[in-house]
Amino acid sequence: MSQKVATKTAPVPESILKKRATSQKKAVDVAKLGRAQQLRNSRLNSVYFKRAEKYVSEYHKTEREAIRLNRIAKNSGTFYVPPAAKVAFVIRIRGINGVSPKPRKVLKLLRLLQLNNGVFVKLNKASINMLKLVEPYVAYGFPNLKSIKELIYKRGHLKIDGQRIPLTSNDMVEKQLGKFGIICVEDIIHEITTCGKHFKQVNNSLWPFKLNCPRGGFNMKKTPFLQGGDAGNREHLINNLIHRMN
């Protein structure tokens, strides 16, 4: 009758056991971080959605109020005068050949260093005077919500450490502007549209918009818009130009 010989299992070296324990701990930690990140993302997505809903409601309310006031004015035989625009969108349409030093300096202050670059500008006495100085070299007017959204979603870039980085996620917004309560792209759009209290910080964080040449081209760059050209203030008609260049 054969006898079974007991075999001894060689002990696992302590170094390997330590490596296994470390690997298992890392796996557990990664899993915990993954769950924590999922919960955080879920909470943030809920916040983003609620903010977007709030802004849409606010925009609709403003629009309905304007329609109501216009109807009242019409029924009473008067005219409804909408509130003065608070924000302009300025597009550089001419080069610097022959530009005198003062307009050249203003173009630099406006960050309009290249042709077909566009920027948002908060309208006040000082900025209006600056725009008058550079009117022969720019086209500007009052962007609507649709234009602002399309510009930011399609051509928005953030200035991060002096570099032009595509605006591709809400995380980027929060890292750059979270200290001002701006945590998502819709916050940026709202701040620009309403000319909010952090307009300056938000606008400075946006790289100038690089636009295309307008479909169909310009008519007469050197001629004022009111005389059938392209230069200067075109008020709400700037939205047509933005659409052609975006």
Swiss-Prot record:
The keyword Chaperone does not apply. One of its GO terms (molecular function) is RNA binding. The keyword Mitochondrion does not apply. Gene3D superfamilies: Ribosomal protein L30, ferredoxin-like fold domain. GO terms for cellular component: cytosolic large ribosomal subunit; extracellular matrix. Pfam families: Ribosomal_L30, Ribosomal_L30_N. InterPro entries: Ribo_uL30_ferredoxin-like_sf, Ribosomal_uL30, Ribosomal_uL30_CS, Ribosomal_uL30_euk, Ribosomal_uL30_euk_arc, Ribosomal_uL30_ferredoxin-like, Ribosomal_uL30_N_euk. GO terms for biological process: maturation of LSU-rRNA from tricistronic rRNA transcript (SSU-rRNA, 5.8S rRNA, LSU-rRNA). Keywords: Ribonucleoprotein, Ribosomal protein, RNA-binding. Belongs to the universal ribosomal protein uL30 family. Binds to G-rich structures in 28S rRNA and in mRNAs. Plays a regulatory role in the translation apparatus; inhibits cell-free translation of mRNAs. This is Large ribosomal subunit protein uL30. It comes from Dictyostelium discoideum.
